[in-house]
């Protein structure tokens, strides 16, 4: 693996990700910042809405934006995973992405199969992490069911991740098996984010305002990633 400092590596990866997005979407983001801790890499993206997407957003076609962007992002993530595995010499376990179109922000979260060298696991926020797990479980129960397992991670002072496993109920599994994965994804996205934003007590847990909440699912692995971005 390259011996360059981790922060320099993150800056390079953020730049390469921006170029990759520009190549595939016709424009790149205004900014892309990388954060790492343990086995996780999070890229926080701002200013990434194309003129066509802006028109669709104004006309209320959010679902069309989401589905078309997901198709292109699957290609981007495949290239990004290959680049990251070469750079860190670690296998990528899973990749997630989500977008807040109204705020023109987004995130890409990568989970490697082991800790990134130089990215030390932060265990200082144990009370915050415990309360975060409890709150995510509470909302998960309202929306669907309690996850079989929930873990929370502090990636940086302003970035937190929550990973849930065993989240799908039987009717959702049947819908996926019958080919309704995209429809289910859009529906879960709208429903869960509504509860997270309007029923969650996350600002009390963090003692700071929350700038963004992102959620993505891997239906085939039956897991989900949530990303909380805090305001400075």
Segment roles from a protein language model:
Residues 2-6, 28-30, 62-65, 82, ...:
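A cross-kingdom feature marking solvent-exposed beta-strand/loop segments within repeated
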Residues 73, 77-80, 166-209:
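Short, hydrophobic/π-rich interface segment
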Residues 200-232:
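Extended, charged low-complexity segments
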Residues 71-115:
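Hydrophobic, ordered structural segments
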Residues 50-67, 120-136, 181-192:
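Inter-domain helical "communication" segments and dimerization helices
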Residues 100-159:
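Surface-exposed beta-loop interaction hotspot
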Residues 35-52, 141-177:
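An N-terminal amphipathic alpha-helical segment
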Residues 2-50, 54-58:
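N-terminal ordered "arm"
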């Amino acid at each position: 693996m390259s011996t360059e400092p981790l922060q320099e590596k993150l800056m390079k990866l953020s730049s390469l990700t921006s170029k990759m997005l520009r190549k595939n979407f016709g424009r790149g983001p205004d900014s892309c910042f990388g954060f790492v801790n343990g086995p996780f890499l999070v890229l926080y993206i701002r200013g990434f809405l194309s003129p066509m997407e802006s028109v669709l957003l104004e006309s209320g076609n959010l679902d069309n934006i989401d589905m078309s962007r997901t198709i292109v992002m699957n290609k981007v993530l495949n290239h990004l995973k290959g680049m990251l595995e070469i750079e860190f010499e670690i296998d990528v376990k899973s990749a997630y992405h989500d977008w807040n179109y109204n705020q023109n922000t987004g995130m890409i979260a990568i989970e490697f199969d082991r800790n990134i060298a130089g990215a030390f696991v932060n265990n200082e926020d144990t009370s915050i992490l415990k309360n975060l797990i409890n709150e995510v479980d509470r909302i998960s129960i309202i929306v669907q069911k309690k996850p079989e397992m929930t873990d929370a991670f502090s990636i940086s002072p302003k970035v937190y991740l929550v990973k849930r496993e065993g989240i799908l109920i039987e009717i959702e599994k049947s819908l996926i098996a019958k080919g309704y994965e995209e429809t289910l994804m859009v529906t879960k996205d709208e429903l869960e984010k509504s509860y997270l934003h309007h029923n969650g007590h996350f600002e009390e847990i963090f003692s700071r305002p929350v700038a963004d909440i992102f959620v993505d699912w891997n239906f085939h692995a039956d897991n989900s990633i949530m990303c909380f971005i805090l305001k400075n």
